[in-house]
Amino acid sequence: MEKDALEVRLKSIRHSLDKNTKLLPGKYRNTLGERLITKWRYKKKSHNGSSMLPEKCKSHVQLYDDLVQESSKHFVGFRLHDLRALLKRICSIQNYTRHVLIEWDVRWVNPLTLASKGWEPYQSASQSQVPFKCCCCHAIMTIPLLKNGDDVADYTMKLNEKIWNSNIIGNHLQKCPWRENQVDLNKEYYLSSQNLIREIERIHTEIDRIVSGSNEFSLKRNSSRIFHYLSEKEIQKLAFFFDCKDYSLVGLLLLGYTKFQKDDLVQCTACFHRASLKKLEYTEFNGHALWCRYYNKELLPTMLLELIGKEDKLITKLGVGERLNKLEAVLQTL
């Protein structure tokens, strides 16, 4: 049916071109979802007294306010699905607290959870606490610092659900959207099949950037210690998938790291912890934060290998004719 409709449309175009007539646009029907969004997105508003529109025409023309735009003006920093903004806040919090005595709670209070509720660093830390500011309502809240001689276990007990509710949530202003909302970390931050494409793009981009860079990266080429948790066949598949002959570089990027300012340092792209290249060669070393999406070093390679395996099976099952037909179908949709 779609093919017949396309042919009718093409005949209409050819007929119009032959007769040099104007082509009538096809009607577009909004879906139910689009109609619902339009209904609740726009709000009627009255005409301005200084409007250039004649009085007799005002009753025939209705003006509307775009509630989405209005909300974005009042809450500039509220972006639930902006991963880049989330990572920027995490990075700023890590840099801000890198040299102070603070023991993050893995579940409730850490740079990731703070950033997911809209908090970012504010001014400088005192001897007893670290202040943070909401990027949206500009409210201020503080996190206590670990004092010399304090027991770490007792300190981390304080950084728990109580501080999450009283400080991280409770210190937002009543009308602040971050008070009732939080970035969906399972969907936006942690690794999943839905966001795996972002990891593929990141690794491809980093390979191009590092390989084409003028400064040589002092990483031992094909050092198996970087990717000791992978078999030789697995690292070969992954390197071939990313079109990179340097196994060490692929292994480094699979761990979530990227080249830092100093040639012998790398930095995680998700928790922003730093490590030297020498430390990475120790098989027991894990430089990521406990809440980091790359803390389980085997997770990302496993997901990519499963994806590669599915592609290989699909290619081997299809004959040449079937592959050509599938390619033709894809091209038709484009």
Swiss-Prot record:
Record keyword Magnesium present: no
The keyword Nucleus is assigned to this record: yes
GO CC annotation terms, alphabetical: nuclear membrane; nuclear pore nuclear basket
Subcellular location: Nucleus membrane
Keywords, ordered alphabetically: Membrane, mRNA transport, Nucleus, Transport
Main location: nucleus
InterPro entries (alphabetical): NuBaID_N
Pfam families: zf-C3HC
Alphabetized GO MF terms: zinc ion binding
Topology class, membrane: Peripheral membrane protein
Highest taxon listed in the record's lineage: Eukaryota
A single BP term in Gene Ontology: maintenance of RNA location
Miscellaneous comment: Present with 2205 molecules/cell in log phase SD medium.
Function, in words: Involved in the nuclear retention of improperly spliced pre-mRNAs.
Quaternary structure (record): Interacts with MLP1 and MLP2.
Name of the featured protein: Pre-mRNA leakage protein 39
Upper lineage: Eukaryota, Fungi, Dikarya, Ascomycota, Saccharomycotina
Gene symbol of the encoding locus: PML39
